[in-house]
UniProtKB/Swiss-Prot annotation:
Annotated phenotype, changing D203E: In MCD; abolishes the ability to sulfate keratan
Record topology, Lumenal segments: 27-395
UniProt function note: Sulfotransferase that utilizes 3'-phospho-5'-adenylyl sulfate (PAPS) as sulfonate donor to catalyze the transfer of sulfate to position 6 of non-reducing N-acetylglucosamine (GlcNAc) residues of keratan. Cooperates with B4GALT4 galactosyltransferase and B3GNT7 N-acetylglucosaminyltransferase to construct and elongate the sulfated disaccharide unit [->3Galbeta1->4(6-sulfoGlcNAcbeta)1->] within keratan sulfate polymer. Involved in biosynthesis of keratan sulfate in cornea, with an impact on proteoglycan fibril organization and corneal transparency.
InterPro entries: Carbohydrate_sulfotransferase, Gal/GlcNAc/GalNAc_ST, P-loop_NTPase, Sulfotransferase_dom
Glycosylated residues (UniProt): N116, N229, N305, N328
Protein source organism: Homo sapiens
One Gene Ontology term of the molecular function aspect: N-acetylglucosamine 6-O-sulfotransferase activity
Protein name: Carbohydrate sulfotransferase 6
Amino acid sequence: MWLPRVSSTAVTALLLAQTFLLLFLVSRPGPSSPAGGEARVHVLVLSSWRSGSSFVGQLFNQHPDVFYLMEPAWHVWTTLSQGSAATLHMAVRDLVRSVFLCDMDVFDAYLPWRRNLSDLFQWAVSRALCSPPACSAFPRGAISSEAVCKPLCARQSFTLAREACRSYSHVVLKEVRFFNLQVLYPLLSDPALNLRIVHLVRDPRAVLRSREQTAKALARDNGIVLGTNGTWVEADPGLRVVREVCRSHVRIAEAATLKPPPFLRGRYRLVRFEDLAREPLAEIRALYAFTGLSLTPQLEAWIHNITHGSGPGARREAFKTSSRNALNVSQAWRHALPFAKIRRVQELCAGALQLLGYRPVYSEDEQRNLALDLVLPRGLNGFTWASSTASHPRN
């Protein structure tokens, strides 16, 4: 068999090229660390629409150590709106990974015209984008206000988002566009990330009541959830979207608690909105401890203010975090929904109610009786609420 002859000079050149390539790859800087040299912590607030996720996002956002973005994957879904939630999972995951690493070039595919911070979805709710080095509307450690930030920072360069992101010890993203946990496994096992998942759930009956108040705003997302190939869905009399949301919460919680992979240990925590509403400071301290943050006196005062307002909040504030009575918000559905609709939600979401610890009601009298507690104690049926304390449910 004839073999081509290769000169020793060519072999030497090839070996040198490989050596230089290896040295280049090894010497490339990895993801930047915040000041102090400690590894950056990445937190994903994983939830669904109308579940209190904007509120929980703000609990992280207002912390002085946090760079926060609200639903960056909104750009994926609005650009690729003819896709389905399942087909867009990988694009959403890849964008989330890039943002966690402060690589804002990932938005090129969705914002080719990007010039200013205001090109980002809900940019002004991010305290980090309203304070140095991104903007000077607020001192870095101050509680920010969207209304004040918008006119002052809208024309700031988009490139400042990366600079700001790299200056914080924690990057927190709130997302409502993941419908199973498995799609996140590559992020959880990625050595470049130090990921924690906060899985926020809410009583499906309360979710339905809130969704009905914001039906128009959710129409495009509903179509993607239902896989309608780009058709918006405002009216959903069959409650198909609510059913899919319930199923997704069950899939995620079961994947995290029944037989979780080793890389998930200590990285997942399930939180019920109702528990936050009842004991906000205790729950928030636990959340902060889980993610390596501490509660400051300034934050404690702010949290007390936004959870002890009057009433459930106006409809125009549906997508905003304002001062409200958190307990009233969590119970409002019991007065607002007809019993027939509640019974239907309970049928469609029976598995979620049982797994997540919500008691069904069997009559209108039970529905209206606020003395009847419908939020069951945590740990019912051996449910593991944080995989940092246990990796398997008890039998």
